[in-house]
Every structure is written in C-alpha cells, then in structure tokens.
Amino acid sequence: MKIKTRFAPSPTGYLHVGGARTALYSWLFARNHGGEFVLRIEDTDLERSTPEAIEAIMDGMNWLSLEWDEGPYYQTKRFDRYNAVIDQMLEEGTAYKCYCSKERLEALREEQMAKGEKPRYDGRCRHSHEHHADDEPCVVRFANPQEGSVVFDDQIRGPIEFSNQELDDLIIRRTDGSPTYNFCVVVDDWDMEITHVIRGEDHINNTPRQINILKALKAPVPVYAHVSMINGDDGKKLSKRHGAVSVMQYRDDGYLPEALLNYLVRLGWSHGDQEIFTREEMIKYFTLNAVSKSASAFNTDKLLWLNHHYINALPPEYVATHLQWHIEQENIDTRNGPQLADLVKLLGERCKTLKEMAQSCRYFYEDFAEFDADARKKHLRPVARQPLEVVRDKLAAITDWPAENVHHAIQATADELEVGMGKVGMPLRVAVTGAGQSPALDVTVHAIGRTRSIERINKALAFIAERENQQ
C-alpha cells in the first residue's frame, strides 16, 4: 500500500506554528514511508477565505521547504463532485432532505438544553413522508447510524470510541446548495486516496462522523492520528501574546527555516535524547508512536538557542542567502564591504537572529554619522589620542592586509606605548565601528578595510581634538 498523507489548511489567516507542525508531521510520515504528500486548500468558508491567506500558506510551506507531491487542490473547485455524491446518497437513502425551519430547530435546541440533554436533531424529516415542492428550501442531512458505535485506533492516542446515539444527523448540504466542511473532507480523502490523516486534536469529534459517511459510501477508512495542541510557556493556549505565531513572522524576525523545523519536530516528538536533527534525520527517525499525547509548551528561548546553533553550524554561504533578505529590509548597500558569507562568520557568535545580524552590520558597509554617546564619552578622550595616532600609522604601513597583520599592528602599538591592549583596542573599536561592541577587533578592522578604517580613525581624532578645545 502506498502511503498518502495530506495537509488541509483553511485559508482564513496565516500559516501558524500549530498548522506548520501538523504539516511537518504529515510530510515526514509520507517521506519516511516513501509515500506522497498532498496539499489541499479547504476554502469552503467563502466569507472568511481570502487569496492573501492562500498565498501566506504557500509562502510558509515554501519557506520551510515542505514540498507537496500533489495539489494544491481547492475545495471550491470541486463542488460539482460533492453534489454528485450527495445526490447519489439521496438516491441510496443514506441521506435525506430536511425542511425544518430555523425557528423549529432553535426551539428544539432550547427544549433539549432545558432538560439537560445534548442538543441534537431529532430526526423528524428522516422519518417524514410529507410531500414538498421541488423549490422548497431544504438542507440535506446524512442518515447517521442510530445504533452501535464508531471505534478507531488513533495512532497517537490509542482506541477511541463514540456511541452513534451521541452523533447528530449531520447537515451535508446547506439551503444555498453548498456542501459542508465535514462532507467535503470525506469525499476529498476518498478521491485523493489518503491513507493517513494526521491533524490537530480539535478534529477528534469530527472523526466518527467522517468515518460513518465513508462507510456509507463504501469507501476505505484512512488511519487517523490526532496531535495535541501547543501551549505557551505559561500553560495557556498559544496566542499572539506569547510572541510570533505566524511562520512567516519567524522569518521576518530572523529565524532560519532549519531552526524552526527542528524546533517544531521536537515539540511533541522525540528520538532518544537527541535535540539537533537534520532534515534527513527527521525523515529517517519519525514515527507516530513517538508523538506525545500531552500538550507541548512553546519555549521561545529554546527556539532562539536552536537558531543560534544553525547560524553557526550551517555553511556561511547558505546562511548568507537568508541574511540577504534582512539586509534588504534594512536598506544596507553591501557593494562596498565584506561578502555576506564572511559577515556571517564575523557576527555568527554574537547574533542569535539574522535580523539582529543585519541591524548590527551597517558599519561594515556604510559610514556612521556619529559615535555612540556612551562609547565616545568613555573611550574617545584626550588620553586616547596618542594610541589612535600610533595604531593609525602602523595600519597605514601594512602592505599585506590579513587579520593577523592587523592584530600585530594593534599589539605593537600597545607594546610601544607600554599600555594594555584595552587602552588601544577600545578607542580603536569605537573609532572604526562607532560603537563600544563588535566582533574581535582584528577581524573587524580587516573586514572594514584599510582605507575606511584610517578615515574613521582620523574622524575620531578630530572628535577628540574638538573635545580638547572645548575644555
């Protein structure tokens, strides 16, 4: 049997982390078994579904490289198929037309609730033989079995059973002729030959209804697995107040897709005590029986730690391709300065996100208007004039410009003046970067370049001279 899974989001918003994890688990299960992964857009909610949301879902899937083998299929383009199946069910007697008014159904609901009963349709039209005009408004309901129970072996939670007496005669076609969500899902899974349905636990109550419809259609019933929800680190359901919840927001905030995927796969699944997984390892090791039944807590600090790991572990050239987008957001012209791959090597240890890296690198490419106020007050004082003049001259004398020679020039200045490296290094750092913090000074000066470094040292000396004149 060929394994076939699907990810079926509703395009009413962005791709959130819960949906992304579900997509990842479905994708991994298919890849682990050499199967196929289908993308289906469940856009039957015409009022809330938007083209922008569809694009956002696609963007998120593509950014995470969760490529699909079939699709995307759109439910709104399959209405003829759904209605043909409903008409067939009406002929076979597994569905019936219901003419009950909204007022009657509301009164029935209130009566049942007053008695402490679970609100459900009473089956009046199921057993009615009244004649109705062809154009009289009606819905179509599924004739759910009235006896027995539905049992399915959830691959994460174990056997789950529902009594058919608890289940309603589900509406499968509305008065406007449009099919309903639960019915469309069933026909899609049948037509697309889905073997395994991996989805959120909020769909557990839909499962017995869908199984009964599949059986009425004499269609194969897929295997089901329901993934637990994701909570914030405070134990409450994940929401915007816990931080970013959109996949593309994490891209915007400077996370690598590898970091988010690694974090999401471990958010409810484990393989021993291993924390870091390549995509190939995820595919190799992923099984549904290793997915936890318990809710997972989203920990942004852990994600940040993983992101920092991947910034330094992945090839700098690859990280640079993702950094480029953030550089563009900051409007930094990188034509005159180090290659982005070299920048990744320079700033990787200091920066935990690519956004932070982009915001920290401007001085490598563009001159700054002024020195940081605290840094200049502390380090660009008259006592720094001589160290800056000496180190400037030594840097200017270097014929070959590797970082090692820059280091020798700084060390030689400290030795000549008989001062500690900090007495030379800190004024030099502020002079060439405009700030009090940077990567190692020798590689920083090397990356900025000889000409630009000397120009900035002269600018710092002019600032010190002006400061002396004001005293």
UniProtKB/Swiss-Prot annotation:
Keywords: Aminoacyl-tRNA synthetase, ATP-binding, Cytoplasm, Ligase, Metal-binding, Nucleotide-binding, Protein biosynthesis, Zinc. A motif ('KMSKS' region) lies at residues 237-241. Its main location: cytoplasm. The keyword RNA-binding does not apply. Its cofactor is Zn(2+). It comes from the Bacteria. InterPro entries: aa-tRNA-synth_I_cd-bd, aa-tRNA-synth_I_codon-bd_sub2, aa-tRNA-synth_I_CS, aa_tRNA-synth_I_cd-bd_sf, Glu-tRNA-ligase_bac/mito, Glu/Gln-tRNA-synth, Glu/Gln-tRNA-synth_Ib_cat-dom, GluQ/Sye. Its EC number is 6.1.1.17. Binds 1 zinc ion per subunit. One of its GO terms (cellular component) is cytosol. PROSITE patterns: AA_TRNA_LIGASE_I. It is found in: Cytoplasm. ATP binds at residue 240. One of its GO terms (biological process) is glutamyl-tRNA aminoacylation. A motif ('HIGH' region) lies at residues 9-19. Zn(2+) binds at residues 98, 100, 125, 127. It catalyses: tRNA(Glu) + L-glutamate + ATP = L-glutamyl-tRNA(Glu) + AMP + diphosphate. One of its GO terms (molecular function) is ATP binding. HAMAP family: Glu_tRNA_synth_type1 (MF_00022). Belongs to the class-I aminoacyl-tRNA synthetase family. Glutamate--tRNA ligase type 1 subfamily. Catalyzes the attachment of glutamate to tRNA(Glu) in a two-step reaction: glutamate is first activated by ATP to form Glu-AMP and then transferred to the acceptor end of tRNA(Glu). This is Glutamate--tRNA ligase. It comes from Shigella boydii serotype 4 (strain Sb227). The gene is gltX.
